Amino acid sequence: MPKFFRLRYSLRECAGDLAGGLIAALIALPYGLALASMMGLPPVLGLVTSIATAPITALLGRNPVLIGGTASATVPFIAKAVHSQGIGGAAKVCMAASVFMMVFCVLRLGRHIQKVPQTVVTGFSCGIGAMMFLSQLGVMLGVKAHVDRTSNNMLYQSWQILSHVSQAQMSALIISAVVIAAAFLSAHFFPKAPAPLVGVAASVTIAVIFGLHQREVGKLPLEIPQFAGFAWHPADVWNVIPEAFGLAFVSSVNILITSRVVEHFRGRHRHLKRADADAELGAFGIANLFAGMLAAPMSAGIPARSLASVRSGGTTRMSNLFHAGFIFAFVALGASCISHIPIPALAGVTAYIGICLLEWSTWRRLPKMRRVDALAFLSTAIAVLVVNAILAVAVGCSFYVARYCYERLSNPVASEDGMGKMAVGAR
């Protein structure tokens, strides 16, 4: 078990973790509710996922600042289960997927994520950043255009929004722009200040002073549901195994890649140990088993929350616990001050984190990179936007596999270290 309680926990660390947990909880509110609705589940279950799983992943997980929650990558699997088997059936699929994740941990499959080249990880980070920014275009512009959410092509969805740019509302654009500008200024002049929170506070102040009215978070008169009731039958095992395995695989890759992105974003060049990746899957497997008992969807790594927490000063496991505590308070107590935050302000926070993820240093080095590294970086970033994150990683890795096969066929002696280079990639 990782060291959870430390002899020294300074007030500065506590303040940073509180700020990081708060901004992560604010980001979780609209997206948790929306994703659960897309799955066909009661919206509150999207928040229950974070409340139920965060304490377990904070205690057992190896990445102290990795924050999980309801993820878009799990939507197709759970939505299909809800449609065919109901909420109880979806709970069975999630619980079976949790068992698969624990099996992956026991088989030590998580450590193989270290074989993904660093250029693929940076391309994944860049693609996720662009996706985070583009996904907020409609909210930041105040455009209420119909967008085909069934398509994974984020570029196509963005084009649908921009084709209705004439309907843009200046108030929404100003609120989101103030968040982004204030966050960047705060990060530049006051590096230790929680930049996303500064941006939200600035946007709320501007909205009140100038009377900029936009849709707000609103009150959350929601109740925590009881444990899900369902019965297992022998035939159910064969019905849930295919979907559960797919859900477990997608969630596992998401968690491990997100963990590497977060470590890279923190500026830590020393990778986590190989065993840490296995333990991370075990921690999320145990946590998701408990979430499944509540009929809540699976928890996976969320880059937006994790990186927003880091940007706000979160450095320890307590930021994850505070994130869950704030969500529980919002749901159970209905914090009135949170209800008045404009939705475009939260969209601005997500867009700000997305801009930070765009790997500007890698873009500057791109002309000097090896051809295979440049192709892997660009293809991964683009594939995240037009296909999905999991296939994007496969596309990026395929260039190194092709290079290894070519070297093995053309020069068998020189190919001895080919696979080693695949695991390192470009620095």
Predicted regions and their residues:
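Membrane-embedded helical hairpins/re-entrant loop segments and their flanking transmembrane helices
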Residues: 6-23, 27-64, 234-318
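Short, non-helical or kinked segments that cap or interrupt transmembrane helices
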Residues: 39-48, 62-74, 113-121, 192-198, ...
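Short phosphate-engaging motifs
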Residues: 74, 289, 401
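Core transmembrane helix bundle of multi-pass membrane transport proteins
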Residues: 1-21, 78-79, 83-272, 325, ...
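Hydrophobic alpha-helical segments within and immediately flanking transmembrane helices
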Residues: 31, 48-57, 71-83, 323-327
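Generic signature of intrinsically disordered, low-complexity, basic-rich segments
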Residues: 32, 68, 419-422
